[in-house]
Amino acid sequence: MTVRIALDAMGGDNAPRAVIEGMLEVQKKRPEVVFTLVGIESRIRQELEQMGVEEDGFRIWHASEVVEMDEKPAVALRTKKDSSMRVGANLVKENQVDAFVSAGNTGALMATAKFVLKTLRGIDRPAIASVIPAVGGETLMLDLGANVDCSSEHLCQFALMGSIFANAVLGVRAPRVGLLNIGEEDTKGNEQVRDAGEQLKARSATLIPGGSYVGNVEGTDIFKDTVDVVVCDGFVGNVSLKSIEGTAKMLTHYLRGAFTKNWKTKLMYLIARPALRCFRDEMDPRKHNGAILLGLNGVVVKSHGGADSVAYAHAIHVAVDLAEKQVTKRIRDAVAKFRAEGTQPSDPAV
């Protein structure tokens, strides 16, 4: 199956070099993927020439403007209609590509994607979702910052989209969905979370197709083999994600310090090096790069702004997976099914 992926060649701290290198890395493993580099053509060609790369297996699509990393989303949306970000989203809308990847300004990407592609019918707001490494596998977490305030209906919609993603992309046959809360008891949390819990419990068969609602989960459960999808609002999700990233960096720092204290610890490092390399690879944030904007009429993946070629390549692989497994269509079909039955994810529980 040929998959067409558009890349924002201007987005991110290391663009366009990291974008091109990431693309070339994916081409080695997936030669059937066809790429479109979107951005200022002269800058892209100059970079390709410096790298000694010939135009093969990809095309260049000129976009005359660039959204800066510190630019306000509303300003970018209003004034930069020919930005690489806007053009990339339009290519998805016009079905010229199957997915779009950008390491650019997160707020501007969300605003642009929502404006151009619109949300799926029956989904009020898109959510940022990402896969977190966990014991025995992986956990999908959403929302990670798109929506600071969420109603119970929004949380239920996130649960629906998350369960479909877990099944289609992560291969979880019966996704277990939990609401991130300050305790496991049904009485814990704010009103929105409590109401969402009641709806998910009453309608898990329709809101979590083929899966189950396991109730409230705490922060420690994210890494356990007890839940496959963790649902929360964007404020809680973003704080949790940054805490996870900070903890991983702290562990790496402590381990490095412990093994470089003296000649004895350095000798111990030589013995433990194979195991430590496995640990490092598992915890490497570059290999978990690629957040998904779920709920749009098209596939959009957000790469970390500081991504290098390894991290960017992983974000591309995420986009290819989403396109191949038709996650957008699956979510659309699930919501359509609810509407045909006279209900939808935003309806109150009955």
Curated annotation (Swiss-Prot):
Pathway: Lipid metabolism; phospholipid metabolism. The keyword Lipid biosynthesis applies. The keyword Transferase applies. Keywords: Cytoplasm, Lipid biosynthesis, Lipid metabolism, Phospholipid biosynthesis, Phospholipid metabolism, Transferase. GO terms for cellular component: cytoplasm. Its main location: cytoplasm. Belongs to the PlsX family. This is Phosphate acyltransferase. The lineage of its organism: Bacteria, Pseudomonadati, Pseudomonadota, Alphaproteobacteria, Magnetococcales.
